[in-house]
Amino acid sequence: MHSQTTKDEQSKDDSSNEKQDAIERRRLQNRLSQRNHRRKIRDRIAKLQERVIASELRAVATLNGWDQASPPAASMMESKPQGDFDSNPLASVSEDPAISNPPQRNVSSNLCRSCCSLLNQMPSSSSLPSPTSPLPFDLGLTNGVDSTNSSPSTLLNSSPSSSQLSPFSLDTSLSMTGLQSQNEFSFPPYPDPPGSQQYPHCPQYYVATEASLPHIMQRLGSATSHPKAIILIPHGHGYAPAPFTGANAADSTGLRSALNGNLNLQNPGRHCLRPDRSAKSSDLGTSGDWMTAPSSTPFCPLHPSQSSSLDNYQSMML
């Protein structure tokens, strides 16, 4: 009898132990499954966060224009040394497609070094195509020709090509300053210059005097609705257009006298100079004797503080 009772107790204990073991196993399995589930959830959350961050970065890049495949022309041209622009011959300049194309020309050849450094620090989205020659001083750069390495006859021969006229060419610059070059050179009028369709929001700059301002506004009123900026040069600053004696396009003496008359800006306190360009010598002599006269003062169109005489320039947006 006693042996049977002990066996029954042992069997009960074994059954209870088995039940407890099964319960413990289930608890352990539940804990492991919960841990695995939490780990999977953490991995999914991390992947979703990475996707959200990547999509936000792409949206910001597309908004600011950082995802452009081609680098801007200003950064590519500024990677070259400063002396390469003045030391290249005329043939290499005319054969270079990046210089012969007006919208892709570098602006740094007409600006000072401080302005060029500021332009390089700007992102590629804000690098709008600034005009290469907003004032009629560097006439050689309007057709992709370096004015320091080319003669006046070369500039005259390259300027009358009507298919390569930019909004700041010889025709527009002389007509804006009061010289009626359409009657002398018989250039056709261009209300929409080439390259303006590519950048419709880029303003077009014109230089005018007080006498020619009504004629310019009447002429620009019939043009298309592009942003335009007129730089008004008042009287009394030495900017008097000299009579253009060279009616013939091949007369280099007339162009030289006209340039010396137009560039006679009395600006004693200069802040933005180009000594490296005026010190260069071309094939026909020094370029400073006809492009920059002793009384002429080349200045940077983007420099904020030139002198007290340049503070009277009035910009009018149409």
UniProtKB/Swiss-Prot annotation:
Q: Name one GO cellular component term.
A: nucleus
Disulfide bridges in this chain: none
Query: Which residues lie in Basic and acidic residues bias regions?
Result: 1-27
Residue ranges of every copy of the bZIP domain listed in the record: 20-52
Q: Where is this region: Leucine-zipper?
A: 41-48
**Residue span of region Disordered:** 1-39, 71-107, 123-171, 269-318
List the biased-composition ranges (Polar residues): 293-318
Where mainly found?
nucleus
CDD domains xref list: bZIP_YAP (cd14688)
The protein's location, in the record's own words, is:
Nucleus
Instruction: Using the UniProt annotation, give all residue ranges assigned to the region (Basic motif).
Output: 25-40
Entry-linked InterPro entries: bZIP (IPR004827), bZIP_sf (IPR046347), Sec_Metab_Biosynth_Reg (IPR052635)
Q: What happens when the gene is disrupted?
A: Virtually eliminates the production of all pathway metabolites, including fumiformamide, melanocin E, melanocin F, but also the sulfated xanthocillin derivative BU-4704 and xanthocillin X monomethyl ether.
Q: Which GO terms describe its molecular function?
A: DNA binding; DNA-binding transcription factor activity
Q: Which UniProt keywords apply?
A: DNA-binding, Nucleus, Transcription, Transcription regulation
Q: Where is the composition biased (Low complexity)?
A: 123-139, 147-171
Q: What induces it?
A: Expressed during copper starvation via the regulation of both aceA and macA transcription factors.
Q: Which family does it belong to?
A: Belongs to the bZIP family.
The entry's function note states: Transcription regulator that specifically up-regulates the gene cluster that mediates the biosynthesis of the isocyanide xanthocillin and its derivatives.
Question: What is the name listed in the Swiss-Prot or TrEMBL entry for this protein?
Answer: Xanthocillin biosynthesis cluster transcription factor xanC
Q: From which source organism is this entry?
A: Aspergillus fumigatus (strain ATCC MYA-4609 / CBS 101355 / FGSC A1100 / Af293)
Q: Which gene encodes it?
A: xanC
